[in-house]
A protein has these predicted regions:
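Membrane-integrated ABC transporters
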Residues: 1-49, 64-75, 93-97, 101, ...
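Short intracellular "coupling" helices and adjacent cytoplasmic loop segments at the cytosolic face
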Residues: 3-14, 102, 110-140, 213-237, ...
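Juxtamembrane loop-to-helix connectors within ABC transporter transmembrane domains
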Residues: 19-20, 28, 93, 97-101, ...
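Hydrophobic alpha-helical transmembrane segments of ABC transporter permease domains
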Residues: 29, 40, 48, 52, ...
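Transmembrane helix-loop-helix hairpins at lipid-water interfaces of multipass membrane proteins
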Residues: 35-89, 96, 169-174, 285-289
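Helix-loop-helix
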Residues: 64-75, 167-181, 251, 255-324, ...
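An intracellular "coupling" helix at the cytosolic face of ABC transporter transmembrane type-1 domains
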Residues: 121-122, 138-147, 151, 155, ...
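ABC-type nucleotide-binding domain
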Residues: 338-339, 345-595
Length: 595
């Protein structure tokens, strides 16, 4: 399994960095116009709403005592008008922000996916795929509302506070100061709770990621689980991971649930002080009933945006951990990329040279040590040797899926690190042992490497590699849906479709890495004619477990101990009676004993 297993938490020790939010703001800039409109609509609607207590004050102090029905009805009409305007503005603002939020999700997810497409194999080797998947889907969904509605609501609630404070001071300065006395207490409380919340929600992020990684792995490996009767053991592991999620979630929610009661407690204390002071001052005749009612209303209004800001604060703290993970992925270096002055690879003739190449996947073991060889255009080369010797590594370096640690890989005399990756790989046909089939129909899978291929070209390629026979018998022929990962196909059928896909791309260099491992011997013999057609005129590298399939190769290289131990034709190596001879005769003995 990947080095970062489902049991390992992804640790982020750095304190919250405001630069995360500043960087995230780049996704908001293109929608700034619509967001400004939304802010203005909400701001104007809110301002109208905060006039209501002053209207009520006038009704209590002027219209009702003087029995001025005309003024009273006018004030009531104003209240109704204010309500209608607020509802209209709020509805328009909501529609705008739904659109903005979905656009932000699209932009972040697109950038994240495009970056993942460019990351080298090493990145995927080191991480469970479930942990990558949760960032693209769940985390982006979580932060999108924070970046759209969250930021707008901060601005709006700050405006609301400003309007309320202004109106409070317009009504009565002394009583307004009493309302504001609770703000310092609130600031101390919010600073205390912030760090505890962030650490708690980071733990939630980690445990959810671990659970998702384990779940994804077990869904893919469900058949193996049942074959080895591992259901009970896997259920126990899943239960432990789920309990970790539950425990960290409960801890995080406990901290989050402190925010609202904390703010509410401060609010209640302040409003109680206002009420008591109002009773005393009203009794002394220094404050009117309308003033007391108005300032009490504004005191209630004052704490509402603060409570809303507390909720927004909660949401921000919850999602900052997700935002960090998203940017952590976006900042993952693309180690295999085009050089600054990379040129387009000319049409490949097929000469491949390894010039003193050294390579290791990590520092613990050197896979290739000072490897040098040259393959002429059109030559077929077989790579043989024990498991883990470096055969697949060699073909991966030719395709530039990894960078060499030392030396050079050249094609037609051109250092492949100095050409664009796209122009290199579009001229290569690479077929791995794991023949990946995408969801969709068979025709789309064969056309994958050549989107403009005609139906006739697809059928001809399939016939050449003996795939047309079984495809024609499928329920809908080439339009048959193969489901996710080609689940309705056998391994042999997947490999034949992959052969057709590779042949259709008409590569100059062909790489077959255990490409016939899942094909039965009878089909492989029938396929041999098609393979010969594929190899003709193309430089090819073949890794095969069944050595009988590579006897006719122009050159066979025995790879072991980080280098080329032997090289020559089948007859030459058999005559030497060295490494290849021992491997071939041992395999031949196994076949004879079995049959």
């Amino acid at each position: 399994m990947a080095k970062n297993t489902y049991k390992q938490d992804e640790v982020l020790e750095e304190p919250f960095d405001i630069r995360h939010l500043l960087r995230a703001s780049s996704y908001i800039k293109k929608y700034a116009g619509r967001m400004v409109v939304a802010i203005l609509l909400s701001g104007i609607g809110g301002a109208f709403g905060y006039v209501a207590p002053m209207i009520i004050q006038r009704a209590l102090d002027l219209a009702i005592p003087d029995k001025n029905e005309k003024l009273l009805f006018s004030l009531v009409g104003m209240l109704v008008g204010i309500y209608v305007v607020s509802v209209i503005f709020t509805t328009i603002r909501s529609r705008i922000m739904v659109d903005v939020s979905q656009n932000i999700i699209y932009d972040i997810r697109k950038d994240l996916f495009e970056h993942l497409q460019e990351l080298p194999f090493q990145y995927y080797d080191d991480r469970p795929h479930g942990k990558i998947l949760i960032r693209v889907v769940n985390y982006v969904n979580s932060v999108s509302d924070m970046l759209s509605n969250g930021l707008i609501n901060i601005v709006l609630e700050c405006f609301n506070l400003l309007f309320i404070v202004i109106f409070m001071f317009l009504v009565d300065v002394q009583m307004a100061l009493v309302v504001l006395c609770g703000v310092p207490v609130l600031c101390v409380f919010m600073v205390w709770i912030k760090n505890k919340q962030r650490r708690a929600w980071q733990a939630v992020s980690n445990k959810n990621s671990n659970l998702n990684a384990y779940l994804q792995e077990n869904i893919v490996g469900a058949r193996i689980t049942q074959i080895f009767a591992r259901e009970d053991e896997n259920a126990e592991i899943f239960k432990d991971l789920s309990q970790d999620c539950r425990r960290t979630w409960n801890t995080a929610v406990r901290y989050s649930n402190l925010v609202w009661p904390g703010i509410d407690s401060i609010s209640v204390c302040v409003r109680a002080a206002i009420f008591l002071a109002g009773l005393v001052l009203f009794g002394q005749g220094s404050k009117s009933l309308g003033t007391i009612v108005a300032i009490s209303s504004y005191a209630s209004y004052f704490w509402q945006p603060i409570m809303n800001l507390g909720n927004i604060f909660n949401n921000f703290i919850n999602n900052i951990a997700y935002l960090e993970r998203i940017f952590e992925t976006m900042d993952e270096p693309v180690t295999v990329k085009d050089a600054e002055n990379a040129v387009k690879m000319p049409e490949i003739r097929g000469e491949v040279t390894f010039d003193h190449v050294n390579f290791s996947y990590d520092e613990s073991k050197q896979i290739l040590k000072d490897v040098s060889f040259t393959v002429k255009p059109g030559e077929s080369v077989a790579l043989v040797g024990p498991t883990g010797a470096g055969k697949s590594t060699i073909v991966n370096l030719i395709s530039r899926f990894y960078n060499v640690n030392g030396g050079r890989v050249l094609i037609d005399g051109q250092d492949i690190s100095q050409v664009t990756i796209h122009s290199l790989r579009e001229q290569m046909g690479i077929m791995m042992q794991d023949s990946f089939i995408f969801s969709g129909d068979i025709e789309d899978n064969i056309r994958y490497g050549k989107l403009d291929a005609t139906r006739e070209e697809i059928v001809n390629a399939s016939k050449t590699v003996c795939a047309d026979e079984f495809i024609s018998k499928m329920p809908d022929g080439y339009q048959t849906e193969v489901r996710e990962r080609g689940s309705m196909l056998s391994q042999g059928q997947k490999q034949l479709i992959s052969f057709a896909r590779t042949l259709l791309s008409d590569p100059a260099i062909l790489i077959l890495d255990e490409a016939t491992s899942s094909i039965d011997v009878q089909t492989e013999k029938a396929l041999q004619t098609g393979l010969n057609a594929m190899l003709k005129g193309r430089t090819s590298f073949i890794i095969a477990h069944r050595l009988s399939t590579i006897r006719n190769c122009d050159k066979i290289m025995y790879i072991d101990n980080g280098g080329i131990m032997e090289s020559g034709t089948h007859d030459e190596l058999m005559a030497k009676k060295g490494y290849y001879y021992k491997l071939y005769t041992a395999q031949l003995d196994e076949v004879q004993k079995a049959g």
